[in-house]
Amino acid sequence: MTTVLVTGGAGFIATHTDIELLNKGYDVISVDNYGNSSPVALERVEQITGKPVKRYDGDVRDEALMERVFAENNIDWVIHFAGLKAVGESVAKPIEYYDNNLYSTLVLLKVMKKHNVKKIIFSSSATVYGTPKELPITEETPTGGTTNPYGTSKLFQEQILRDVHVADPSWTIVLLRYFNPVGAHESGLLGEDPKGIPANLTPYVAKVAVGELKEVQVYGDDYDTPDGTGVRDYIHVVDLAKGHVAVIDHIDKEGVFVYNLGTGHGYSVLEVIKAYEKAAGHPIPYAIKPRRPGDIAACYADASKAEKELGWKAELTIDDMAASSLNWQTKNPNGFRDAE
């Protein structure tokens, strides 16, 4: 039986990945401090799959805790999701972002090395490409020139992982660069549950659609894009989750492997709002605001390498993303808090 340690295992992308792993017959162990998530999410994973998740409640930066996790379990793979993830907040709180994101990775790698566990999938991001010179973005597109500490922290973590492989080529390191994960589990039991006002577009649009917030804030309508609003490659979180399972199923050799996980198609902010209007059956009010610091005009993937090497491709559409996200929001207006 393959055992997978999922750091930040109660998070948005992680819980959807937990489900795909459990459904494939893998054992899942979660370490999470619930800084931006809820233990209820793991209960929902168990409810959906009918299988247990072994929980360790705590911080990946706690070396004694991580030592215990590795001593008590026979871990085959690690998927490292744990970290802070809001672009705007990272600009305001760079020290916290570097401390949390880099230190957690260093502690994790130190303990993995000690216990001779050398297979890791790292939850990276398209932000490592900075402002891309050309689109679509391939895995060969230069990285660097990141526009915010969140993206820079992901780039630094990628470099740390590459250096670990240089020092010891017996490691298997997979860098998955996510584009913009959205949507929710079809059951309506799991979805994105940001604490406070959502920093990401789609949970914000969903809250406006159900009348919880007044209007969508559209940051900038003067970008060099077809309708002036920012264009991103939105990918359904369930497709993204399946990408992680595809890695474990397909990669059985040492090395550093890099994959973009996106749909290959960019949608503007206004197109996303239209998809939510279609799902909700009514107009969604929005207001144009100034651009946000650290944002870029457009970003979308060429994900053909993942299809060729992992047999993976995104299958769900922007309409699926909007409908599932609204279903989650309608059934859980307060996220997981009602069940806590």
From Swiss-Prot:
CDD domains (alphabetical): UDP_G4E_1_SDR_e (cd05247)
Gene Ontology annotations for the cellular component aspect, listed alphabetically: cytosol
GO MF assignments: UDP-glucose 4-epimerase activity
Alphabetic keyword roster: Carbohydrate metabolism, Galactose metabolism, Isomerase, NAD
Residues making up the signal peptide according to the UniProt record: none
Pfam families named among the record's database cross-references: GDP_Man_Dehyd
Cysteine disulfide partners in this protein: none
EC top class named in words: isomerase
InterPro entries referenced in this protein's UniProt entry, alphabetically: NAD(P)-bd_dom, NAD(P)-bd_dom_sf, UDP_G4E
Record: residues binding substrate: 125, 150, 180, 200-201, 217-219, 232, 292-295
Record: residues binding NAD(+): 12-13, 32-37, 59-60, 81-85, 100, 125, 150, 154, 179
PANTHER family referenced in this protein's UniProt entry, alphabetically: UDP-GLUCOSE 4-EPIMERASE (PTHR43725:SF47)
Protein name: UDP-glucose 4-epimerase
